[in-house]
Design a protein with these regions (language model features):
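Alpha-helical transmembrane segments within multi-pass membrane transporters and channels
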Residues: 2-41
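Structural signature of hydrophobic alpha-helical transmembrane segments
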Residues: 4-14, 80, 151-161
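Generic alpha-helical transmembrane segments of integral inner-membrane proteins
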Residues: 9-21, 47, 81-89, 129, ...
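Hydrophobic/aromatic residues within transmembrane alpha-helices
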Residues: 43, 112-113, 166
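Membrane-helix/interface signature in polytopic inner-membrane proteins
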Residues: 89-129
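Transmembrane alpha-helical segments in multi-pass inner-membrane proteins
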Residues: 132-135, 145-172
Length: 172
């Protein structure tokens, strides 16, 4: 019985906190980021199962919240426009700002980036926080689109994400 806006803010705060924890595990404890992400994802999944009692949550979203994910503009779902805006913002950051260059440098060769003066720990930590925040945004939009929450949704997207990392030639 919580307003959708408040639930969205809490969701984003929780996701950002998960990003901070991931950053700590990767940067301070020196755990491989892929392994840390999978491990923390499992812990978060267990917490979600416990909190939700493994139930689907339906018919509790307001019509306004559902419109946020279901409306169309010019015959195209609004979710496409959200993705387009996010993509443009991320592209701009990556291609036209020092932070974007630092992210590319850190991802390409962390040691060389560090020797060039890039604060690689800060970049890795910030990237994990930003990724977690964006995952929260995606979860909110997804819930608005389908009109429900279930703890079984996330794991269905894990294998395609791992495959994307693998086929994208990322270092595991």
């Amino acid at each position: 019985n919580m307003p959708a806006g408040l639930a969205a803010v809490i969701t984003l705060l929780v996701c950002t906190t998960v990003g901070v924890i991931s950053g700590f595990v990767v940067v301070k404890l020196k755990v491989n980021s892929f392994i840390a992400t999978l491990g923390i994802g499992q812990v978060v999944s267990a917490i979600v199962l416990k909190i939700s009692f493994n139930r689907q949550i339906t018919d509790t979203f307001s019509p306004t919240f559902e419109k946020f994910g279901r409306n169309q503009y010019l015959g195209i779902p609004v979710v496409f426009y959200y993705l387009l805006i996010a993509g443009i913002v991320i592209w701009y950051i990556m291609e036209h700002t020092p932070v974007g260059r630092f992210i590319y440098a850190t991802g390409g060769n962390p040691e060389a980036a560090r020797l060039a003066g890039v604060k690689t720990d800060r970049i890795v930590w910030g990237s994990l926080i930003a990724s977690s925040f964006l995952a929260g945004v995606a979860g909110i939009v997804f819930s608005a689109k389908v009109g429900l929450f279930t703890s079984a949704t996330g794991p269905n997207y894990l294998f395609p994400a791992i495959a994307a990392v693998f086929f994208g030639a990322s270092q595991l």
